[in-house]
Amino acid sequence: MPHSIDMEDSSAIAERSKHAGLALEPEACFNLPQPTAEDRQDNWQTQYHSSEGAQGGSRKAQAADATTGNPTVDDASQQNGLLQQWVKQGYFMPAEHGSKAGNDVKHKYSPPKSDVWGVLVACTVITTWAALFYHSIFQIKLPSIEQLRSGNYNPSDFTSWPHVLLAFFSLEFLYTGLFITTHDAMHGTIAMRHRKLNDFLGSFAISLYAWFDYKMLHKKHWEHHNHTGKVGADPDFHRGNPSILPWFARFMMEYSSLWQFAKIAWWATGMQLLGAPFQNILMFMTAAPILSAFRLFYYGTYIPHHPEPGPASDKVEMDWTMSRTSTAPSLLSFLTCYHFDLHWEHHRWPYAPWWQLPVCRKLAGRTNPLHTEALQTAEPSRLEHGG
């Protein structure tokens, strides 16, 4: 059983939460009563200690998982120790931790026991993006816009279009990976035990992506997790028009700023001074990240959280428990958006890194009644709950 968190620890957590946009008192972190529909910020320690008993003996649960082929289940005390570390670093998500949704499977997942894999995955994404970015910006030869208009150029003097398209879509996919890396950092899942390293990698990745402000993203993302699907409270949710294009436009405006555009202009100018052609900058530094942003929005916001069509769909709230989850094979889910389409699992286990979300999907199965209830209203497609 992990040691109890004293008030000094919880005060520090409250202070971190305040910086992240949540006005939580120390008692709000650990000593709230059982959740209601309006307030689901219950006692974290009670919740996870009770899950120990719910397992009916952690060793038996491990044996059961071994026979069914499910991922290994750590005992509750080990899980509590890891999650306690997560909470002490200031990554508490009260709206989700206090929810009863998925309580029957919540205790089965434990975060990685080491930060090595998280850091290695993040660095692999960043360095692979950097290598392809350099090749795309400085080594690919594109005809100028004027040459394309007039048709007065020799194709053999330039990089073949199949090569260009392969580089473009590969780089766009890696841009998406940069954002997913930052998203993991905001949840502390790159380096759970080393907050400074975790936040450095997240901030660095989002600067390479499009010079977003990491602290602003972190604050708004906490708001999203605490008020998922609530009009006017969730910064990712629509503001009264759930149609895809107006929602995407508002989504982009929510996170953009003049200072960000100034930094992008500075970055592009620097690339030109180093010899990058304008057409390469336009294609690989402008079009690719914009397409990536739409990919992230579509699979990480619109599909999981959009309300069902109807006369009052603009007023329907989409609590996180109603998030849709893809049933696509793991490889396709990865190629789609780094498993960002496994969205119910992400909200149930916000301390799971993106590369372990397929594990969470296996653990979730269809054991939670909320999955099947929500499935009745989900759109008839491959996207459903608890796949």
Curated annotation (Swiss-Prot):
| The reaction(s) this protein catalyses | echinenone + 2 AH2 + 2 O2 = canthaxanthin + 2 A + 3 H2O; all-trans-beta-carotene + 2 AH2 + 2 O2 = echinenone + 2 A + 3 H2O
State the protein's purpose.
Answer: Involved in the biosynthesis of ketocarotenoids which are powerful anti-oxidative molecules. Catalyzes the conversion of beta-carotene to canthaxanthin via echinenone.
Q: What cellular component GO annotations does this protein have? A: membrane
Q: Which GO terms describe its biological process?
A: carotenoid biosynthetic process
- Source organism per entry reads Protosiphon botryoides (Green alga)
- Tell me the protein's name: Beta-carotene 4-ketolase
**InterPro entries assigned:** FA_desaturase_dom, Fatty_acid_desaturase
Q: In which pathway does it act?
A: Carotenoid biosynthesis
What are the EC numbers?
1.14.99.63
UniProt keywords, alphabetically: Carotenoid biosynthesis, Oxidoreductase
